[in-house]
Amino acid sequence: MKIVDVHNHFYPPEYLDALRSGKSVVRVTADAKGNPLIHYPGDYNVAVAGHRDIAYRQGVLEKEGVDTQVITLTTPGTHVETAKYAATLASLVNDAFAKIVSERAPRFAALATLPLSDPAASVKELRRAMEELRLPGAMVFSNVNGIALADQRFWPLYELADATGAVLHIHPTSPVGVEAMTEYWLMPLVGFLMDTTLAAAHLVFSGVPERFPRIKWVLGHLGGAIPYLAERLDRGYEAFAECRKNIRRKPSEYLKTWHYDTVNFDRKALELAIEFAGADRVLAGSDYPHLIGSIPSMLASLRGLPSRTPTKQTFSAGMPLVSMA
């Protein structure tokens, strides 16, 4: 079974150097092993070797049997910076990603990062990433400094993504209400999934997929609670006029055309997502190399599916993420 891992993260060394320059709101220190610690409001990440050494990472993929990874940046993203520096960092990251792809394809493909705090600059950078760097789309965060992805300031970005058939992979970030999630790592364990669910539902009810039907949406972490809550969203559509204002079909009909990555390694949850969206819309994802991610767990969950599940179709196609790269 060919494996295309569409949910994983990489910090280009050039990006880490830029964070250390003193121009960023992000602070970089080091742990006892010398790994960079990336501090940003409300959280921090440990950048282990797999986060920042592409040769090391390629060796891991070869050992584990992953054919391709579609690499993306991760939190804190560039939108936490000033608009000008966000655009600088996004271009730097995307140039680094394009270089990795040019040198190491088909082992690696990539999605662009965007300076989402500046919607106009995001349009410009997505166009550059797709036309000049030949990246198939971008990863976007589930909110932008508290602003919903459904906000109309982002619609010019969606207009371009629709015109080009771009991939937009929604990845969670610090959610609204994060002040209630300061203990027990509740923000990534619970808050991330809540924010993904909220972003997807808000986009649908706002009419974004109705207006821009050619965007190829991907939701991380099996869509948060979307497969579980879709029936409730449909009942809202039937019960409340406001929920019908911008869309002509039930929310689930839009959401079933989206893609969902498998960064939830529970077999029953994976089967629910497959039942909801179809096997061809559920994509392999590991969240490597985060502490909570796992390539072996990703592989075990896929191989543990019932034999009737068309896993070869599901996890070898990698949707247009790779074929467009």
Question: Model segments located where?
Answer:
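Helix-coil boundary/capping segments in enzymes
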Residues: 1-325
